[in-house]
From Swiss-Prot:
Pfam families: AAA (PF00004). The keyword Nucleotide-binding applies. InterPro entries: AAA+_ATPase, AAA_ATPase_domain, ATPase_AAA_core, P-loop_NTPase. ATP binds at residues 125-132. Belongs to the AAA ATPase family. One of its GO terms (molecular function) is ATP binding. The lineage of its organism: Bacteria, Pseudomonadati, Pseudomonadota, Alphaproteobacteria, Hyphomicrobiales. This is Uncharacterized AAA family ATPase y4kL. It comes from Sinorhizobium fredii (strain NBRC 101917 / NGR234). Keywords: ATP-binding, Nucleotide-binding, Plasmid.
C-alpha cells in the first residue's frame, strides 16, 4: 500500500485503539519488507512503549438462556482465557475482523437500511496457526459466549440422527446470542464428490447446507478447517467471510517472539531468529520459546540465553523432520 495512504489511514484512526494499532503495524511491516530494519525496530519499540491499552474487565456477556437439554450433548461453553494482546494476525485478517466487530455493534442500523449483517465465517489454514485462538478472542471482544460444537457427539452412526443433531445445534444458536464454533469442520462438510462417501454422509452435507442458509444467528457462526480442499464446493458461498491463517512470515514471527518473551528476561534479541523460523506454525514457535524458558529455569539462570533458544529450535526441527517422514503414511 502507498505510504501516503497508510499515513492517511493512521491519522483517520487516531483515538480508536484497535484501528490505530493495526495501521501502525502495517507501516512497520512495510519498513521491514524494505529492509529498513533500524527504523522498523525503533517504530515498534515506540509503539510497544506507548500508553498501554487498559486491560479492561471482560465485556459483559450476552445473557444466557436456560441451556436446552436438546443441545446440551452437542455444544460446550468455552471460557475465554486470552485477549487481543495474545494473538498475532496478518494485517488483512485484522482489517476483516475489525470490520465484523463494527458491523455487529451497528447491526440494527444496518438492518434498518435493508442490508444483511455478516455473521458466518470460515477459518482455513494449517494446524497451529491461530484459528481456534482467534475464535475465542473474537467472541470475547464482542462480549458473546463461545460455544464449541462437540463433533464426536454430533456425528452418529444411526441413520438420519446426525442431521437431527445438527438441527438441534443450529436451533440453539438461533435463540442464544453466541459465537457457535465448529472446529474440524471438514468432518461434517466433506465433498459429496468423494466416491468413498456413502449416502448418509451426503445427506448430512445437504442438511448442513440448508441449516447454514436458513440460519439467522444473534451472534456468529465460525467454522474452522485444516483441510479446506476436502470441503464440499457448495459450502464456500454459504459463508460471508473466509479468513486464511497461513504460517507466519518473518515480521509476524518477530512480533510473536517478543510476545512470548515479554515477561521473561533474555540475554539476546529473540526477533533476530525470525528468519530461521519461517515455515513454522505459531504452535511450533511457541513450543520452541517454552522449551528455551524451561532450560533457563532448570539451570537456575536469570536470563534465557541464545543457546537455550537454539537448542530448542534444533529439537523442534528434529520433530518436524520426523513428522515429514510420516506424512505419506497419514
Amino acid at each position: 500500500m502507498a505510504r501516503g495512504e497508510l499515513m492517511k489511514k493512521l491519522l483517520a484512526s487516531y483515538g480508536r485503539d484497535e484501528d490505530f494499532r493495526a495501521v501502525a503495524e502495517q507501516i512497520i511491516d512495510e519498513e521491514e519488507k524494505k529492509n529498513n530494519r533500524v527504523l522498523a525496530r525503533t517504530l515498534r519499540k515506540t509503539l510497544e512503549a506507548g500508553p498501554q491499552r487498559t486491560q479492561s474487565a471482560p465485556k459483559a456477556l450476552a445473557p444466557l438462556i436456560p441451556f436446552p437439554e436438546a443441545a446440551a450433548d452437542f455444544v460446550e461453553r468455552i471460557e475465554p482465557e486470552h485477549n487481543r494482546n495474545d494473538i498475532v494476525l496478518s494485517a488483512a485478517n485484522v482489517r476483516v475482523l475489525l470490520g465484523l466487530v463494527k458491523e455487529f455493534r451497528r447491526a440494527d442500523e444496518i438492518r434498518q437500511h435493508g442490508l444483511k449483517v455478516r455473521s458466518k465465517m470460515l477459518f482455513c489454514g494449517p494446524p497451529g496457526c491461530g484459528k481456534t485462538l482467534c475464535a475465542e478472542i473474537f467472541a470475547a471482544e464482542l462480549g458473546l459466549p463461545l460455544f464449541r460444537v462437540k463433533l464426536d457427539r454430533l456425528i452418529s452412526s444411526y441413520l438420519g440422527e446426525t442431521a437431527t443433531n445438527i438441527r438441534k445445534t443450529f436451533e440453539f444458536a438461533r435463540k442464544q446470542p453466541c459465537v457457535l464454533f465448529f472446529d474440524e469442520f471438514d468432518a461434517l462438510a466433506r465433498t459429496r464428490d468423494d466416491s468413498g462417501e456413502h449416502n448418509e454422509l451426503r445427506r448430512v452435507v445437504n442438511s448442513l447446507l440448508l441449516f447454514i442458509d436458513n440460519m439467522q444467528p444473534k451472534g456468529f457462526l465460525i467454522a474452522a478447517t485444516n483441510l479446506d480442499r476436502s470441503l464440499d464446493a457448495a459450502i464456500w458461498r454459504r459463508f460471508d467471510e473466509v479468513l486464511w491463517f497461513d504460517r507466519p512470515e518473518a515480521a509476524m514471527i518477530g512480533r510473536f517472539l517478543k510476545l512470548k518473551f515479554k515477561n521473561v528476561p533474555v540475554a539476546f534479541d529473540p526477533a533476530r531468529n525470525s528468519a530461521a523460523l519461517e515455515g513454522y506454525s505459531f504452535a511450533e514457535i511457541e513450543r520452541v520459546c517454552t522449551q528455551a524458558i524451561k532450560a533457563m529455569i532448570i539451570e537456575r539462570r536469570k536470563q534465557v540465553q541464545e543457546r537455550d533458544f537454539n537448542r530448542a529450535l534444533q529439537d523442534e526441527a528434529r520433530r518436524r523432520a520426523g513428522q515429514a517422514r510420516l506424512a505419506p503414511m497419514i
